[in-house]
UniProtKB/Swiss-Prot annotation:
Protein name: UPF0335 protein Atu3758
One Pfam family linked to the record: GapR_DNA-bd
Protein family membership: Belongs to the UPF0335 family.
InterPro entries found in the cross-reference section: GapR-like, GapR-like_DNA-bd
GO molecular function: DNA binding
Amino acid sequence: MMDETSTTETVAAAELRQFIERVERLEEEKAAIQGDIKDVMGEAKGRGYDTKAIRTIIRLRKKDANERIEEETILQTYMAALGME
């Protein structure tokens, strides 16, 4: 009985270690990708593009059309309420 518990704990520890190591590898890949994105944005900035606008466009492209329209409508409503239009 004790041997079975020990085996179960060993298997659980090995499985836990695998999960942790997978996440660590993904974090390393994520850092590399973030570095690549930074390089691309630096290149765009060097060519005269506004990186803030590029990031906004990327964020908007991730949303579906209805969500974008709703966000724009709310923004326009708030701007009008503040006399900004």
